[in-house]
C-alpha cells in the first residue's frame, strides 16, 4: 500500500504533461500559410524544417523562396 503513495505523484505528473501535448502540434493550414508543405518524417534536400503538421509530418520550407 505504501507504493501507491509513491506512484500517485508520478502518475499526476504524466497526466499533466499529456494534457497539453496535442496543442503543441501545428496544422496543415498553418504550414501552408507560411508558404511551406508537409513531408513525412524528414524534409527533402534544400528545405528547412519550419514546424510540424502532425506527429510524423514536418512542415518544410524551401531555402530559396
Swiss-Prot record:
Primary localization class, coarse: secreted
Q: Which InterPro entries does this UniProt record tie to the protein?
A: Defensin_beta-like
- Superkingdom classification of source: Eukaryota
Does the keyword section mention Protein transport?
no
Localization, UniProt: Secreted; Cytoplasmic granule
- Signal sequence bounds: 1-19
Q: Which GO terms describe its biological process?
A: cell chemotaxis; defense response; defense response to bacterium; defense response to fungus; killing of cells of another organism
What keywords are assigned to this protein? Antibiotic, Antimicrobial, Defensin, Disulfide bond, Fungicide, Secreted, Signal
**Which residues form the pro-region?**
20-25
Q: Which residues form a coiled coil?
A: none
Q: Supply one GO CC term from the record.
A: extracellular space
Could you tell me which cysteines form disulfide bridges? 31-59, 38-53, 43-60
Q: Which GO terms describe its molecular function?
A: CCR6 chemokine receptor binding; chemoattractant activity
Tagged with keyword Secreted: yes
The text of the family note is: Belongs to the beta-defensin family.
> What's this protein's function?
Has bactericidal activity. Potent activity against E.coli ML-35, L.monocytogenes EGD and C.albicans.
- Annotated protein name in UniProt: Gallinacin-1 alpha
Amino acid at each position: 500500500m505504501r507504493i501507491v503513495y509513491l506512484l500517485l505523484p508520478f502518475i499526476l505528473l504524466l497526466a499533466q504533461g499529456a494534457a497539453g501535448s496535442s496543442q503543441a502540434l501545428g496544422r496543415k493550414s498553418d504550414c501552408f500559410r507560411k508558404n511551406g508543405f508537409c513531408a513525412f518524417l524528414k524534409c527533402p534536400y534544400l528545405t528547412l524544417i519550419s514546424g510540424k503538421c502532425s506527429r510524423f509530418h514536418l512542415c518544410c520550407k524551401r531555402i530559396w523562396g
